[in-house]
Amino acid sequence: MFATASAAILMLAACGGQATKAPVTTVGEGLRFCESTYPYEGGVLIANFGTEELNPLNGEGKGYIVRYKAGEAPQVVIPADGNLSAPKGMFLRDGRLFVCDVNKVVVYDLNQPGTAPQVVSFPEGELFVNDLAADGDVLYASVTNTGRIFRLDISDPAVVGTPEPWLEISGPNGLVIRDGAMYVASYPADGQTTDAHVIYRIADLSNPVAEPFVALPGQYDGIAFSGDGKSLYVTNWSPAGLSRIDLATRAVEPVAIELEQPLAGPADMTVADGVVYVPDLPNSWVVVFAE
């Protein structure tokens, strides 16, 4: 089976109450170093490196994208065609799938499978292109190793604009946007966590100023809004785990996931239709549970 239900449980402690338990499913078959997920047709797309060894900056061209939906067989949506090496954050607009990769964003037309993708190159040295989020016709792309967020014109998704530097933040990784505000998960590209590696908020995209939203340092990777829009989920590599942030109070609540093999590197997560998908990059599986 593509997805196997394990004996794992999820425990989310309610404020002042007992921890609740829910079953957790692990999805592993057909995946190899899965860094990112994105909602798609009632399930998710899962981006895989496909390499023998884990290297987020590899250039082997073995990357591929799989569609997973509970109860259905897996489907390879984008095979290893040589254009993807370490695919990370994704974004979908008008049937075109934007995929972050090393020093570029690759754009596939899902309405025309097999056609050559558009490759949007980033400036030299902008290697760790990590995540994408859009506000209208502007697509934002984080580059973790240089501390920059770029903006791209996607008013015509078939002809994507040239990346333009927009804002600098220490280690920008995961991005989400809602109601005109951006939230950024910060990750140290060199593995050395500092006080600058926190969760940031940019309240006004037209006049961008990054302010710490949660000042607890970490190695933050994925970030997603909860289904009710009242919280943020964030993944952290050190310590490896998942937390939930109340947007009104900024209180941080750990989400305890008990697995036979613990999370090692939870990455670019998705929340869709009441289900949470957390890719665990080093373990090559996705942890799935209901909110």
Functional labels for PLM-detected ranges:
Residues 30, 45-59, 97-103, 139-146, ...:
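Conserved beta-strand positions in repeat-built beta-propeller and related beta-rich domains
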Residues 30-42, 81-96, 123-140, 168-181, ...:
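Beta-rich, blade/repeat-based domains predominating
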Residues 265-291:
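Blade-level signature of beta-propeller repeat domains, shared across WD40, Kelch, NHL, RCC1
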